[in-house]
Amino acid sequence: EVGLETLQGAAKVVPGADGARWIAIAPSPKATELAVRLSPEDVEQPGGETIPLQSLLDGGPRRWPIELQTAVAPGKPLEGYAADLLTVPFANPYGSWMRISAMDFFQDGRMAVSTLSGDVWIVTAEKGPGGALRWSRFAAGLYEPLGLKVVDELVHVRGRDRITRLHDLNGDGEADYYESFHEDSHEIGASYHAFVYDLQCDPEGNFYYSQSGYKSPLTGAVVKVSPDGKRSSFIGRDLRNPNGLGSIAQGITVADNPSGKAVFNGFMLA
């Protein structure tokens, strides 16, 4: 049995074919809030406590409270550069396979890192030479994220299925809300090679990513997404496997890998 309690607005349960039940919501310029209760038995009105929806929008308790620490091995200057070695916590209590796939930085210097298996970690460096790194798991369950960009201090992740924007609603260091910021029907390919790469922005706030056209039903291309995530367009097509998208002041650069008789094509979009 289906019970319906309308908390705000107008709605009712109407019967459908084969015993189905539909909820008909009356047109209204305001939001409609309702509670649906289900019972396996025939009852006059399924009961139960109504949970305030706002309580579900404030963020929940941390799921991954353990903070990991790894070492930094300072590099020796070599022809003007010193390459430090940042240790990755390959052994971790969550069994997370730490294959780093993308990274970007917050304004305070913290680093957001994604892994191919679908995690996002926040990495904080301790002050001073040789300071340790503190790793905190921020999100999990994303679909092979190969691009990450911090915009307005919010982590945006380019997975195989969409751009996801991550919100920490209660400031406890973990994402509570995984917002589907942008998705298109052409983005997912069944092939094992249908990868979607990178995530960059231009000065106007547009996003860019590239997608493989090799052994894939996707169009090998560079895609431009509007700052609000609502519109997208191809700005470069007929690319084989353009893994390597960079942003410079004059535009976007792409490197397309050659193979066999394929011709290397790198180009800049001004």
What residue spans do the PLM features occupy?
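Beta-propeller domains with acidic blade repeats across secreted/periplasmic ectodomains
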Residues: 43, 48-270
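Extended acidic/polar, glycine-enriched regions
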Residues: 3-65
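Generic structural motif recognizing short loop/turn segments at the entrances and edges of beta-strands
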Residues: 1-2, 8-10, 17-22, 27-34, ...
